[in-house]
Amino acid sequence: MIRIGHGFDVHAFGQDRPLMICGVEVPYHTGFIAHSDGDVALHALTDALLGAVALGDIGKLFPDTDMQYKNADSRKLLIEAYRQVRAQGYKVANVDVTIIAQAPKMRPYIDQMRQTIADDLQCDAMQVNVKATTTEKLGFTGRGEGIACEAVALLIKQ
């Protein structure tokens, strides 16, 4: 049996912290306003994984009202969510992540992002795709106010 999940997340810029995308620190003058480290890509991916096995979403598993997740490393959240996916008897066939941002440019970091996700999901980097696009200066991402991300996860029965 195969299962598919979709995730979406968005965070605004504005906090003095590192900008984390797909578990990689991307040089930029500001970070995200968020309860955790704000990694929109890993949050969207976590939602996709959880959704594929009907385990809800990142907010259910790691509520932002719980102080233990304050400034949490999103890689740890992804790893825990994937542990729960595996406990349901599924593993990653492939994942696809789309980062929607006017800036900063993601291309120099894509290979590292793919490998980081592959490491966290215990799969080959060829099972992970990360790409970035802009909104041609339209909307909040186009104005440089934040970043959005979508992710899809295809899971197969172990």
Curated annotation (Swiss-Prot):
Disulfide bonds: none
Matches recorded under Gene3D superfamilies: 2-C-methyl-D-erythritol 2,4-cyclodiphosphate synthase
Superkingdom as given in the UniProt entry: Bacteria
One BP term from GO: terpenoid biosynthetic process
Cofactor: how bound: Binds 1 divalent metal cation per subunit.
Catalyzed reaction equations: 4-CDP-2-C-methyl-D-erythritol 2-phosphate = 2-C-methyl-D-erythritol 2,4-cyclic diphosphate + CMP
Entry keyword set: Isoprene biosynthesis, Lyase, Metal-binding
Binding site for a divalent metal cation: 9, 11, 43
Enzyme class: lyase
Pfam short name (any one): YgbB
Enzyme Commission identifier(s): 4.6.1.12
Pathway: Isoprenoid biosynthesis; isopentenyl diphosphate biosynthesis via DXP pathway; isopentenyl diphosphate from 1-deoxy-D-xylulose 5-phosphate: step 4/6
InterPro entries attached to this UniProt entry: MECDP_synthase, MECDP_synthase_CS, MECDP_synthase_sf
Record-level Gene Ontology MF annotations: 2-C-methyl-D-erythritol 2,4-cyclodiphosphate synthase activity; metal ion binding
Protein residues bound to 4-CDP-2-C-methyl-D-erythritol 2-phosphate: 9-11, 35-36, 57-59, 62-66, 133-136, 140, 143
Assembly information from the UniProt record: Homotrimer.
Entry-linked PANTHER family: 2-C-METHYL-D-ERYTHRITOL 2,4-CYCLODIPHOSPHATE SYNTHASE, CHLOROPLASTIC
Name listed for the protein in its UniProt record: 2-C-methyl-D-erythritol 2,4-cyclodiphosphate synthase
Taxonomic source organism: Actinobacillus pleuropneumoniae serotype 5b (strain L20)
Lineage of origin: Bacteria, Pseudomonadati, Pseudomonadota, Gammaproteobacteria, Pasteurellales
Gene name as annotated: ispF
